[in-house]
Design a protein with these regions (language model features):
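Short beta-strand segments
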Residues: 16-54, 60-62, 68-72, 80-84
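Generic structural signal for secondary-structure transition and capping sites
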Residues: 17-18, 67, 108, 129
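Short acidic (Asp/Glu) patches
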Residues: 52-56, 65-69, 99-111
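Extreme N-terminal tail/first-helix region
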Residues: 1-19, 145-153
Length: 153
């Protein structure tokens, strides 16, 4: 991955506080939004982190099937990111505290949400992503992180 691609991904992710996550349970899809914070984009990895209400359907679905689809972008898409990822529920208390702190720094709304409800911290290891840009610049930026879950249509 070249520096331009890395910078494109980082700049895109920094603009948004929430993502849409698609989970599945027994063949039934479920899509909802969650607050997220991004880790660094490296040659081999991109991790996103979020908190999920402990009694939520999406968290229960992740326990059964950690493979997810992601969408980040505006309501009227002119530029958007779609991705596949593998979710894991964090158990290390310092890692959980770090996710909550970083979410609060990125989004005051997320901080208020986290303070009001019991949450679990989740790591999303991105396998594949594509940014589509209809407003100028490269139309598509696509990256695979060397995994078995290629994206695309």
């Amino acid at each position: 991955m070249d520096n331009t691609t890395r910078e494109t991904i980082q700049a895109f992710l920094a603009q948004y506080e929430t993502l849409a996550i698609a989970t599945e349970n027994k063949g039934r899809p479920y899509v909802t939004r969650v607050f997220f914070v991004e880790g660094p984009v490296t040659e081999s990895s991109l991790k996103l982190y979020g908190t999920f209400i402990t009694s939520s359907r999406k968290l229960a679905n992740l326990r059964e099937n950690p493979r997810v689809g992601l969408f980040i972008g505006p309501s009227t898409p002119s530029i958007w990111l779609e991705a596949t990822a593998e979710a894991s529920i964090l158990t290390d208390e310092s890692a959980i505290a770090d996710v909550r702190e970083k979410l609060g720094e990125k989004s005051p709304t997320a901080a208020g949400f986290i303070a009001q409800v019991p949450t679990a911290a989740v790591e999303l290891q991105v396998n594949w992503l594509r940014i589509t840009n209809l407003s100028g610049g490269p139309v598509q930026t696509e990256v695979s992180f060397g995994t078995e879950f290629p994206g695309g249509e």
